[in-house]
């Protein structure tokens, strides 16, 4: 279920999806700008891998970076994540990974790779997300409401109304939040 829809932004704004049961013992977060840039963040007990692509950066048949080059030096357990059907379908123009959540690794490629556009979206700063939202939502997202979501504050009807006053499908929103394990008081 779409995490953003569950947070009250509506079907038309689906850009991000979180799946806490993506694979056995693994979670995934998917993000897209709706056109040429996409990212998948894969969480496993062995670490985390972020794969991203900008489909307009390369001639897909000739110059796309090879997965082997992007994952050179990556631990085998994390390399398996890069073999998922989602990554194969999406392709890759950048890949970063960590085993401990502190030190991140990448194999930089020549030229643009979309990382400067996509990685800031998951920097943990609510202001970054509010700025990102200006490109996609008809009204500015309220910083305080976004901050509450980032802090894990339980979703209430008041919080949903702050994000989108037109949403009132409480059971649908609650079901979506329950599915991804996000706390709520709906």
Where is each model-derived feature located?
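Short, solvent-exposed coil/turn segments at beta-strand boundaries
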Residues: 6, 24-25, 43-48, 100-101
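A eukaryote-biased signal for long
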Residues: 103-186
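Surface-exposed beta-loop interaction hotspot
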Residues: 67-124
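Aromatic- and glycine-enriched beta-alpha-beta binding-site module
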Residues: 28-92
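Intrinsically disordered, low-complexity regions enriched in Ser/Pro/Gly/Gln/His and often acidic
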Residues: 15, 22-23, 90, 97, ...
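Short linear interaction motifs
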Residues: 11-34, 75
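Single conserved hydrophobic/aromatic residue that forms the stacking wall/gate
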Residues: 2-13
């Amino acid at each position: 279920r779409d995490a953003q829809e569950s947070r009250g932004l509506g079907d038309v704004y689906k850009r991000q999806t979180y799946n806490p049961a993506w694979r056995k013992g693994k979670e995934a977060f998917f993000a897209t700008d709706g056109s040429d840039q996409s990212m998948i963040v894969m969480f496993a007990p062995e670490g985390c891998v972020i794969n991203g692509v900008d489909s307009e950066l390369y001639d897909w048949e000739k110059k796309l970076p090879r997965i082997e080059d992007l994952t050179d030096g990556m631990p085998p357990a994390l390399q398996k994540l890069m073999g998922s059907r989602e990554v194969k379908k999406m392709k890759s123009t950048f890949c970063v990974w960590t085993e401990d959540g502190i030190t991140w690794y990448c194999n930089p490629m020549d030229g643009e790779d979309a990382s400067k556009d996509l990685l800031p979206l998951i920097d943990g700063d609510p202001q970054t997300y509010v700025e990102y939202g200006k490109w996609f939502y008809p009204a500015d997202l309220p910083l305080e409401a976004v901050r509450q979501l980032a802090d894990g504050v339980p979703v209430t009807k008041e919080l949903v109304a702050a994000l989108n006053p037109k949403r009132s499908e409480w059971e649908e929103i609650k079901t979506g939040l329950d599915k991804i394990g996000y706390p709520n008081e709906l």
